[in-house]
């Protein structure tokens, strides 16, 4: 949430001359308004519109860049320059840590899961995931090519702010700039909305176990989910104002999920032996190890660590990247060890089956009000 708010804050500051902090408040207020009003429905429909804007803007920017400057890739930065993945001198540990954190750590993201769980059927969810993967790869490649070209031809650097914003402000035609900026805002709003909605829903439903009450004048689950959004946006806004680095905040979020939850989540899909003890121990150890490493690191993913750093002589910049991979390995090892020492108990399994059955009944009740979806009732809930 904070990482996406930073992008909006910088955008409003540079192009609308709105102070950074006020820009964040305005952005989060707009996202919160439509998220509270429509929940997953508004999140899904606005997401579809926002995706269309982003795709059109990306293609337009790529075409303009190619026609104006050509596509220029600096030496050593091309797709076949594998030194970036094999040589520590070229940042291989950091690059691998980024790929693993974003590629595996993001699997645990609940704003992603809510879209999967909300799909009409498993088949629809599968097709949507593959389609989204292709579009994400294409859009990411486009912006990478544009950024590399801008750096090589125009000499733009991140020292003067986001390279994309400099390019849009000084070089790109106004109409195209507006379209691309709309795409940036759309992408940020879509992710921020999903983060707000998913986090509040999990806190209320899974942590505090609030449930819908049939026949109630005001559904307590809906009321408390909306109420939980307020503190979430306050904390996210505070972090965005204090740590104004989009890439660092986004990567840190996935980095922590990788260290705490990714291993147990993926293994738990296929391996029924682990129980609560294994999950909680692995998550606790992973979090502790990653925070300690973060405090010792002078740099974090290649930039100065201004999040949490304790000056020391034990750890140098060479440890950057390795910290992410090592924390994940330690957490996963603890999870496997605890799974063998303290397997899932019969009581835990019985409780989980009861939860699955309750979810199945709740889903059937909800789908009964939507006849066109009735054939897929129960499709998204299985014993696994």
Describe these PLM feature segments.
Residues 1-384:
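Membrane-embedded helix-loop-helix hairpins and adjacent transmembrane boundary segments
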